């Protein structure tokens, strides 16, 4: 269930097939009898149970279509044992051809181009549905001929390439206190492209509900008090952007806004610099991020688990290819990083993957090291180790003045890795970080690296938060 609700929240198309007791046992208190489809209905886009063998193909076809269409997500099909054993007399449904959308209305595109030119400081807010390869290419083309500033959500990471770095003002998500948040507050026109509220609730970046918003997407917006678009350009996003490019070619930010953007860009760059700490005993988060940044290449996939480390990574780790820096921002599912990294080595063969977790989150799926070893997955898993569920800990301390239920005993992660047949490494002091990471990245197959981390500066992560942002 956790995997499917994560897929639905994050917009990942998944089709799950499940066994079920035979139909005659469905209403009995028999072994393993439960209403599977009813259980999964609230957390999937489509959930059904096959009652007639001749309906199997129809149900599978509709489940597949639901998972792939609109806002993508999970579908679930339950198949009773006696249905599985029965002959099927009906013909299978022919392969589906997904409907193709055209661009948005020409009049709406003209309206948007005019609105951008009239605004003092328009900004693009790029979300997860803007991260497909074709949409990313059009966004990069648009930025090559305009000066439009850009903010990414965590799940929009990598849309901006090295060439558009001057247009980039960071990522926003979870806590409202970043340069990108300042830009959204200062802007008089937010163009939300492929943005989903689950990535970063509008109440966080548009608390007063006064932002002027125009949407470019392939699905209608989800409206609430803090997200009321002036207009929506609904259609194929890449085709819409392709038509917008000539309408906006040569656009420059208003002179009065350029100094503000220069100052904001300086803030963003300064925030990435690790602090100088004399006689450092345990590594600062920014030191770990910087060391990873030096070693991770653009073609590597980096999957990030949930925890304090994920906030530091989302804010400060730069990725320049779409869908190469992965976060679970919808459900914030603990344990996703290692399985995602294993999957990345399968869909991107020959490319090393990196997964990053806390010591608590790692133990939600650490057993998948066996899978990684069996598949010879070429990955490096980094554990930020502090002996706590720290993301919960620092928020409890901010809200209640103390923490409870967040501490656990030491785990020897090196021996844990070795027990599964993986290589285990540990950073025993800050000066060893570079050497240990070099060894890890040079080693083929699964490698686990245990890095002690100092989260003393975590209070800064939550600075200037709204009261209801503390979970």
Enumerate the predicted regions with their spans.
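A conditional alpha-helix N-cap/helix-loop micro-motif detector
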Residues: 56-57, 102-109, 173, 282-285, ...
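Short beta-strand segments
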Residues: 78, 303-305, 450
């Amino acid at each position: 269930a956790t995997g499917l609700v994560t897929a639905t929240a994050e917009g990942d198309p998944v089709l799950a097939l499940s066994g079920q007791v035979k139909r005659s046992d469905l209403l009995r208190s028999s072994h393993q009898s439960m209403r599977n489809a009813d259980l999964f209905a609230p957390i999937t886009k489509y959930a059904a149970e096959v009652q007639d063998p001749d309906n199997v193909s129809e149900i599978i076809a509709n489940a597949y279509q639901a998972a792939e269409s609109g806002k993508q997500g999970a579908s679930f099909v339950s198949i009773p044992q006696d249905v599985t054993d029965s002959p099927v007399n009906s013909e299978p449904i022919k392969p589906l051809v997904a409907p193709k959308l055209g661009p948005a209305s020409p009049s709406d595109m003209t309206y948007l181009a005019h609105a951008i030119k009239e605004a003092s400081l328009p900004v693009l807010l790029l979300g997860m549905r803007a991260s497909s390869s074709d949409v990313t290419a059009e966004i990069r083309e648009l930025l090559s001929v305009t000066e439009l500033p850009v903010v990414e959500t965590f799940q929009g990471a990598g849309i901006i390439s090295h060439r558009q770095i001057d247009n980039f003002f960071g990522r926003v998500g979870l806590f409202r206190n970043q340069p990108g948040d300042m830009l959204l507050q200062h802007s008089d026109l937010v163009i939300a492209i492929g943005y989903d509220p689950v990535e970063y609730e509008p109440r966080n970046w548009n608390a007063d509900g006064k932002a002027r918003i125009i949407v470019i997407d392939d699905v209608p917006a989800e409206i609430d008090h803090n997200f009321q678009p002036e207009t929506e350009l609904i259609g194929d996003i890449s085709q819409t952007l392709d038509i917008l490019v000539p309408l906006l070619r040569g656009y420059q930010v208003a002179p009065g806004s350029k100094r503000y953007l220069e100052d904001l860009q300086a803030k963003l760059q300064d925030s990435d610099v690790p602090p100088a700490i004399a006689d450092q005993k345990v590594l600062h988060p920014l030191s770990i991020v910087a060391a990873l940044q030096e070693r991770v290449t653009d073609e590597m996939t980096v999957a990030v688990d949930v925890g304090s480390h994920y906030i530091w990574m989302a804010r400060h780790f730069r990725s320049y290819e779409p869908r190469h820096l992965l976060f679970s921002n919808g459900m914030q599912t603990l344990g996703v990083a290692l399985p995602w990294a294993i999957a990345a080595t399968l869909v991107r063969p020959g490319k090393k993957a990196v997964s990053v977790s806390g010591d608590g989150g790692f133990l939600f799926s650490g057993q998948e090291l066996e899978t990684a070893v069996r598949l010879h997955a070429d990955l490096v898993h980094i554990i930020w180790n502090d002996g706590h569920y720290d993301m919960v800990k620092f928020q409890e301390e901010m809200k209640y003045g103390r923490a409870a239920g967040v501490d656990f005993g030491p785990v020897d992660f090196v021996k844990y890795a070795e027990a599964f047949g993986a290589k285990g490494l540990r950073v025993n002091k800050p000066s060893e970080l570079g050497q240990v990471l070099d060894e890890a990245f040079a080693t083929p197959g699964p490698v686990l690296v245990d890095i002690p981390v100092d989260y003393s500066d975590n209070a800064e992560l939550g600075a200037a938060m709204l009261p209801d942002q503390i979970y």
